[in-house]
Amino acid sequence: MGKKKSKNQLNTGGVPNGVHNTKKEAALPPLGNKLGSASFTAINTLTKPALFSFYDDDITKNEGNVYDKALLSNASQLEMVPPSATARHERSLYAKIINTIAAFFILFIAGILFPMISECLFDNDQLAKGDIVSFLKHGIEIKNKIVAEPDMVPDWAVFGTEGVIFGSIVPFIDSFVRYQHQPKTRSSVYKNTLGSFIRCANTLLGLIFGIRKLEWSSSLQAAGAWSLLNIVLWLFFDGTLTVFFPGLVIGALSAFTCSQCFSQLSLALYFIDFYFFGFLMFSKLGRYLFN
């Protein structure tokens, strides 16, 4: 500690008699427009001790430099903020082509597996085994009409093409509504991951198992419960309107193409529920692969 100055060297204001109104505090170095003089004054008042003027100049000069350097260091750290996570380097054309081919191939394989899963959906009342896959078989009927030799094109190729179409609809819509340019929050990035797609697929398998094994009073009760659950699952897994409205349209088309759905409301709800959630699953896979 420095030696204290004698009382006869201080006036009533705590300033030495010989340098009253002549000694000025050294001005803090400017830090740009982000920090104004008011901020420096406030920080200076809070950090420097109240009895600052009682010490010798050699002590106060060194302490002032320490405080000023600390302020400069904090300001430099504020200016060195890393760029936003949304700023990505543009991929080369070759990388984009490889990514697109891989995405189409994976969606094609998923389209082949999807009818196999749908054949496992049935209950013990009105929904028989294989009824729900009738909507996907319309693609085979279209193939038989437009292809000169239908036997040359296998049925699994039709199902794979349908998988590519279902998985590409939402990424195609996103390119128009500029979904990829919206702020990438942690929740949105979390929802478009491979792990999220796997959880969605496991949920579909759990729903199919629940419809088959649980004791329902009627098919309408099971289909209605699935309809209410679909809203919660959509909010949990995705929550975007670009999936909700196209999913409803595809579900309604699947129910409209089934002749039995006109007389049985439970079958219509089954078709809407299954293909809405299936479209949600393909949309998540497509977003993950293309983005």
From Swiss-Prot:
One of its GO terms (cellular component) is cytosol. It is found in: Endoplasmic reticulum membrane. The modification Phosphoserine is found at S39, S76. GO terms for molecular function: unfolded protein binding. Residues 1-23 are annotated as: Disordered. Pfam families: INSIG (PF07281). The keyword Transmembrane helix applies. Residues 118-156, 252-261 are perinuclear space. Keywords: Endoplasmic reticulum, Membrane, Phosphoprotein, Transmembrane, Transmembrane helix. It is a multi-pass membrane protein. The chain crosses the membrane at residues 97-117, 157-177, 231-251, 262-282. The keyword Transmembrane helix applies. One of its GO terms (biological process) is sterol biosynthetic process. It comes from the Eukaryota. Residues 1-96, 178-230, 283-291 are cytoplasmic. Present with 1900 molecules/cell in log phase SD medium. Belongs to the INSIG family. Stabilizes the HMG-CoA reductase HMG2 by preventing its HRD1-dependent degradation. Binds directly to the sterol-sensing domain (SSD)-containing transmembrane region of HMG2, promoting its folding to protect it from degradation. This is Protein NSG1. It comes from Saccharomyces cerevisiae (strain ATCC 204508 / S288c).
